[in-house]
Amino acid sequence: MKHDLETLKHIIDSSNRITFFTGAGVSVASGVPDFRSMGGLFDEISKDGLSPEYLLSRDYLEDDPEGFINFCHKRLLFVDTMPNIVHDWIAKLERNQQSLGIITQNIDGLHSDAGSQHVDELHGTLNRFYCNVCHKSYTKSDVIDRTLKHCDNCGGAIRPDIVLYGEMLDQPTIIRALNKIEHADTLVVLGSSLVVQPAAGLISHFKGDNLIIINKDRTPYDSDATLVIHDDMVSVVKSLMTE
């Protein structure tokens, strides 16, 4: 492990176009449940009596707008979550002008909360909301502080700005993500199993020098990586910062 940390530190210190690709594992230490792991968010959502895929779908929003927004307020707001040391470390590398930015599968908005400016959120973010009818924009603070569920302009359901089942990923976001990967000298994957498509397929576009994967479990790209560390991200970053 010590040798891996030394290798990781050397690669990070010698890179100046790092792109980060992050998944659910990064935010677990902040109290955000992993969606699909045992005991994760999907398990919790299943207790509501409908399938997680339906509750997080465009169909549910259209079939039962009131039920959808009540579900969002109950399960998705993550009111007390804060960035952890991994989010802070990534933001610091961006401030030091070593990083091109972040591509994330997460919807919790914690990278932005940590101060990162260049974040491509493939599945959207819970930091932004909008009316499903007139598209008036709202912040997360608007929704939480006022327990706001209906648009004060037209009365429509206020939904989070996330990609629901049955909706397309935002193409400008995909293009920006591809650009970050194609121009990176080092790609660091953190807390992602790299199996969810089409997001995970972006990794195949990396042609830079070093692919680093830090994840508790194996991924389909482990054999292609310069360095693989199967460990907890928080532990790795803490150790890295004391090296």
From Swiss-Prot:
Cellular component, GO annotation: cytoplasm
Alphabetized CDD domains for the sequence: SIR2H (cd01411)
Active site: 123 (proton acceptor)
Superkingdom of source: Bacteria
One MF annotation (Gene Ontology) recorded for this entry: histone deacetylase activity, NAD-dependent
EC number: 2.3.1.286
Residues binding Zn(2+): 131, 134, 151, 154
Catalytic activity: N(6)-acetyl-L-lysyl-[protein] + NAD(+) + H2O = 2''-O-acetyl-ADP-D-ribose + nicotinamide + L-lysyl-[protein]
S-adenosyl-L-methionine is among the record's keywords: no
Domain named Deacetylase sirtuin-type: residues: 1-243
Gene3D superfamilies assigned: SIR2/SIRT2 'Small Domain, TPP-binding domain
UniProt keyword terms in alphabetical order: Cytoplasm, Metal-binding, NAD, Transferase, Zinc
Cofactor mode of binding and number, as noted: Binds 1 zinc ion per subunit.
PANTHER family, per the entry: NAD-DEPENDENT PROTEIN DEACYLASE, NAD-DEPENDENT PROTEIN DEACYLASE SIRTUIN-5, MITOCHONDRIAL-RELATED
Family label: Belongs to the sirtuin family. Class U subfamily.
HAMAP family: Sirtuin_ClassU
Protein name from the UniProt record: NAD-dependent protein deacetylase
Species: Staphylococcus aureus (strain COL)
Name of the gene this protein is made from: cobB
